[in-house]
Amino acid sequence: MKRSNVKELRKLAARIRLETLKVIHSRGFGHVGGSMDLADLMAVLYGEVMHFDPKNPRDPDRDWLVLSKGHAGPAAYATFGLMGFYPMEDAYTLNQPHTRFPSHTDRKLTPGVDLTTGSLGQGASTAAGAALGNRIDGRRNRVFCVIGDGEADEGQVWEAFHFAYAHKLDNLIYFIDNNGYQLDGRTADILDHGDIAKKAAGFGLYTQEIDGHDVQAIYDAIENACAKKGVPSCIVLDTIKGKGATFAEPKREHSSQPGEETWQEAISAAQQALAALD
């Protein structure tokens, strides 16, 4: 990937972080931690990798994103707004009456959302089903699925990996957001997965582990995965929960409800981070 593209993707990630904060701020509270740490991945997917048409979100030949950790919806809403699926301001109605932007993603409400998620683990399975269905239909598109490391407590995730391997779904790439924390604390203290990359590889998936905030590394890992034939892939993203949110990153918070002054400080810091990339 060209150096100029890397710079633009870093800017896009910074914009996604800023807009994610604004989206959640519109409600006053929400899932900041697990949304902010996905900005770099979302920037690479929608800024460089995926085939999609904002004017035709149901294009049958589009690439799919299944945000299995559906509570990170604000990161998706920010990305879709920046990509032109709808005016960005529309997403500033997060979780409010009659909104199209619930806290967890819903394909019937929000343009750009491919599958409804939120019940942890289920997105891993539905992504595998979508990948198999697309292959049966003769389509050459890909399905990308994002799973949280805390979500991987669910046995359904590993059953989905087994299914994907058994059906040789090489049009399916899983990402594990390995930020080390979940709702109730450190993942290692609640249900220790050990070496989660090694575990995914043990289910037969072509597995890579990378810095989840390095856009070049993310792009290269996706390129490697796309080149693999006959097996599904898993990319473990080592991330920092709450990355870029001044009040959430130090505490690795899952959900946050700061005061207005704290919100404004965080938004200002995100604006400065974006400006520094110009």
Report residues per predicted region.
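Glycine/aspartate-rich loop-and-adjacent alpha/beta segment that forms the canonical ThDP
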Residues: 215-278
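N-terminal capping segment at the start of a domain
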Residues: 13-29, 177-179
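Generic beta-sheet signal
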Residues: 63-65, 141-145, 172, 231-239
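N-terminal hydrophobic or amphipathic helices/low-complexity stretches enriched
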Residues: 1-16
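Cofactor-binding active-site loop characterized by glycine-rich and histidine/acidic residues
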Residues: 20-23, 35-166
